[in-house]
Amino acid sequence: ISIPGAYAALEADRALDEGLSVFMFSDNVTIEDEKALKEKAHSKGLAVMGPDCGTGIIQGVPIAFTNNVAKGSIGIIGASGTGIQELTTIIDRLGEGVTNAIGIGGRDLKAEVGGITMMDMIDAMEDDDTVKVLVIVSKPPAKEVRDKISARLSNFSKPVVTLFVGEKPEYHEENFYHAYTLDEAARLAVGLVRGTKVPEATVDVDESEFYKAEDGKTIKAYYSGGTLANEAAMLIKDAMNCKVPPEDVEGYMLQLDGNVVVDLGDDAYTQGKPHPMIDPAKRIECMQEAVDDPSTGVVLLDIMLGYGSHA
C-alpha cells in the first residue's frame, strides 16, 4: 500500500478482511491505527509490515526498495529499511544469502504498539526451516518491548544476532549475539551459518591526507537512510570521544561544533515530497552548502542503490 497516510489504514483494513497480509509503504498513519491494524492481523494469523516500511524480501523475492541479493539461510527482521538493505548486501558480498527480510515499520517497537509484528515474525522465522540464523535490527526499543523480545529470543531455537543501533554491547550470550555495527551483525550471521569466524573488514588509508585538529575542519553528513545516519553519528561521536546524547530532531542525529549528521529521509523533509532515495534534490542542495562552507573538511554520504532507488 503506497497512498497518502490518511487513506492507507482503511485500505489495509480491507486487505486484512480479504485474508491478505499488508506491506505498507505509506507514512503519516496514526499510531492508534497502526496498533489496531496489527492486532487485527495477529488475530487472523496475518502480518502488517509498516507503516513507513520500504524494504522487504520474502522467500527471496524483493519488495520495494531492495537489492538483488542471493537467496540463502539467513532471516532478518528490521524496524529499519536501509539497515536491512545494508545487512543483506554485506551478507551477499560475503558469499551467503537471505531467505526472508521482513520490515516491520519504525514504530513497531514503541511502547504504544508493543512489538506486535516483531513478535509474530520471530515466531514465523522459527517455524521456517529454511532460516538457520536470525538477525534483528532496529533502534533501541522501548524497555518493556525490549524485555519481551529478549525473553523470546533467549528461547529461540536457532542462533540470533541483535543490533540495536546506538548501543555498544559488551558481551554475547549462549546462541544470542549482540552486534555494535551493521557490518559486525552481518559478519556474525555469516560466521554462524558457516560455523567459523568471519574476519573484520579492513581499510587502508594514507594518514598524510588527514586534516589536523588545529585545522578546525568539520564533517557534514547527509544521509538518505535513517539507520545509516544513526550509525554514522554513533561512530563519529566514538571517534571524537564525545558523550553527547543522541539527537533525532528534524532528522539531525548529530550537531556538535559544526559537525552535522542529518537523515534527509526524516518526515520533516518528506512531507509532500519524494524520499531522497528517489529524488536527491534536497541532498544536492545540502551538499552545495557544505562545499561553500570553508570549515567543511569532509562531506559524508550514503548511496542507496537497488530496486526503486534514485529512479
Tell me what each language-model feature is:
Residues 1-311:
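Catalytic-core regions of core metabolic enzymes
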